[in-house]
């Protein structure tokens, strides 16, 4: 989680446009959420008291709301896209891949008998990676960079 949070912070450090002010606020909220997630993950459910931080469904719903808001401003995808564009977008794509790795590791840990990682925590990190994908595209749009489309077999045409 620390690596993921750090890359989000790195992406935010490059935001200097008013066009991305709202996204910066969302990313700041996510950075705080990731600390909450870390607190949730470090204490097994059986050892938590009622006041312990836990990722609950409202975290997931808030992310889904933000995904819908940003995605509503983007053109529908016609192809897969390649990570890139602006520095901010590129760092957000790196954060997205780290979120996917965290998700895989959390799922693996959930399968261990003694693990007590909540389904809400896994849902949150899953939705976060989706949010970061949409956010990277949103950054490129707002900063007038086009998505880089994947062209299957482009390098091997005769």
Regions found by a protein language model. Name each.
Residues 1-158:
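Phosphate/pyrophosphate-binding loop motifs in nucleotide- or prenyl diphosphate-using proteins
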């Amino acid at each position: 989680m620390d690596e993921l949070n750090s890359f989000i912070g790195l992406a935010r450090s490059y935001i200097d446009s008013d066009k991305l002010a709202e996204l910066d606020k969302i990313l700041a909220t996510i950075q705080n959420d990731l600390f909450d997630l870390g607190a949730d993950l470090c204490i097994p459910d059986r050892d938590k008291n009622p006041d312990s931080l836990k990722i609950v469904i409202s975290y997931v719903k808030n992310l889904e709301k933000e995904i819908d808001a940003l995605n509503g401003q983007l053109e529908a995808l016609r192809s897969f896209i390649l990570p890139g564009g602006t520095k901010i977008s590129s760092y957000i794509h790196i954060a997205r891949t780290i979120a996917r790795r965290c998700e895989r590791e959390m799922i693996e840990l959930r399968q261990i008998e003694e693990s007590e990682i909540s389904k809400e925590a896994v849902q949150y990190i899953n939705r976060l990676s989706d949010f970061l994908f949409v956010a990277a595209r949103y950054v490129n749009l707002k900063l007038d960079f086009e998505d880089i489309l994947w062209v299957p077999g482009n390098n091997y045409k005769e």
